[in-house]
């Protein structure tokens, strides 16, 4: 992996998203400015960490970061805008929610939303940039908790297990029970289920 070279600035925010692929729920983003005086050991892409480790880091990031913020785009916004534009909106909301204005923003992936400060997209940033790794952890823990809460209301869909992604089990239950109000109606499998139900 090519070592990432940071921009020459102090207040760098990292931004990442979770939940572009699922058929249900919001896309959740986070923005994090880390404190160089309070390093956090073991930051890595949230998908590579165990749930226990993620939860421990989640608490540590919230405690030690100079500033952190969550952003989101709800299913109806995803349906209105499309998933890419809704993700960009959620990222803008996360950055706007920081109580300290960053001087530079590093975003996981290959494109940046329009922001009032300079920004750069970093491919595989969640495993190369500590701030993006931290954002990835906050976003994933938050969204996973939302899926667990939704699972209590709709136990038949198995949201706690598949987190809303289009697994064979989820698609089977979608066909069997139809879509909930939390499903993304513009996504093809949900659209099909709605057409079958009508």
From Swiss-Prot:
Subcellular location: Cytoplasm
Classification via InterPro entries: RNase_HII, RNase_HII/HIII, RNase_HII/HIII_dom, RNaseH-like_sf, RNaseH_sf
Major localization listed first in the record, in broad terms: cytoplasm
Disulphide bond pairs: none
Cofactor note as given: Manganese or magnesium. Binds 1 divalent metal ion per monomer in the absence of substrate. May bind a second metal ion after substrate binding.
Gene Ontology cellular-component terms listed: cytoplasm; ribonuclease H2 complex
Top EC category: hydrolase
UniProt keyword list: Cytoplasm, Endonuclease, Hydrolase, Manganese, Metal-binding, Nuclease
Pfam families per record: RNase_HII
Substrates-to-products reaction catalysed: Endonucleolytic cleavage to 5'-phosphomonoester
UniProt domain RNase H type-2: residue ranges: 10-198
Protein name: Ribonuclease HII
């Amino acid at each position: 992996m090519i070592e990432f070279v940071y921009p020459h600035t102090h207040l760098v925010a990292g931004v990442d998203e979770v939940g572009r692929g699922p058929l249900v729920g919001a896309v959740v983003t986070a923005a994090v400015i880390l404190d160089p005086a309070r390093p956090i050991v073991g930051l890595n892409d949230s998908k590579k960490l165990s749930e226990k480790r993620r939860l421990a880091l989640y608490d540590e990031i919230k405690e030690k970061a100079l500033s952190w913020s969550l952003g989101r785009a709800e299913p109806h916004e995803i349906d209105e805008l499309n998933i890419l534009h809704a993700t960009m909106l959620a990222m803008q909301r996360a950055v706007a929610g920081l109580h300290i204005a960053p001087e530079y923003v590093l975003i996981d992936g290959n494109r940046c939303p329009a922001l009032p400060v300079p920004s750069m997209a970093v491919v595989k940033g969640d495993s190369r940039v500590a701030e993006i790794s931290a954002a990835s952890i906050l976003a994933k823990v938050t969204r996973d908790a939302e899926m667990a809460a939704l699972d209590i209301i709709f136990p038949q869909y198995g949201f706690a297990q598949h987190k809303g992604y289009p697994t064979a089990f989820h698609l089977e239950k979608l066909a069997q029970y139809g879509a909930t109000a939390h499903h993304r109606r513009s996504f093809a499998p949900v659209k099909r289920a709605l057409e079958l139900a009508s």
